[in-house]
A protein has these predicted regions:
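Alpha/beta-hydrolase superfamily serine-hydrolase fold, recognizing
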Residues: 3-178
Length: 178
């Protein structure tokens, strides 16, 4: 690892904490691909520390800059604040790509669970709004449906650590207007 730095990204709802990872070695020459990373959280828990090792591995293994985004969490920050943070962070990466040492033509988004939802939203919004160009999505067990009326919810409701009841709780905190 060449270096790791914490940074605050300007956002619609205030600063967004981020951690930026730069790789070391021969692949670190020239403009590098950039991966905007959204950690898993159920929209409620965890932060930059929870995916520190994952981000390091992605950075070193892929030879890319990783910008890990600590988006706002529910219940204090309900939808759409986390999606606003994800969009603002991605746009900031594009606007500051050269300064970071990145290649604006090789921007990817990545997310785990709730972070996968945010990565999906960013990619869809970029497509609808005509940019920024997202060349790749790495979605790891993304939350893509907010309804629990599916065969998957019934079939895997219990016994897999993340239960249907816990998912309902996360989504209720994220979407409920109370």
């Amino acid at each position: 690892m060449k270096r790791v730095e914490n940074h605050d990204i300007p956002g619609l709802h205030g600063p967004i904490p981020a951690r930026i990872y730069w790789p070391d070695g021969p692949q670190a020459d020239g403009p590098l691909p950039v991966l905007v990373h959204f950690h898993g959280s159920g929209f409620v828990v965890l932060g930059l520390e929870g995916h520190y090792n994952v981000c390091r591995e992605l950075c070193e293994g892929a030879g890319c800059i990783v910008v890990a985004v600590n988006y706002r969490k529910a219940p204090e920050n309900k939808f759409p604040k986390p999606t606003d943070d994800a969009w603002a962070a991605t746009k900031w990466v594009v606007e500051n790509c050269a300064e970071l040492g990145g290649d604006v033509n090789r921007i990817a988004v990545c997310g785990y669970s709730a972070g996968g939802c945010l990565a999906t939203v960013v990619a869809q919004r970029a497509a609808v709004e005509g940019g920024p160009k997202i060349v790749f999505q790495l979605l790891v067990y993304p939350v893509t449906v907010m309804s629990d009326d599916t065969e998957s919810y019934r079939r895997f409701a219990d016994g897999y650590n993340l239960t249907a009841d816990l998912m309902r709780w996360f989504i209720r905190l994220y979407l409920n207007s109370e």
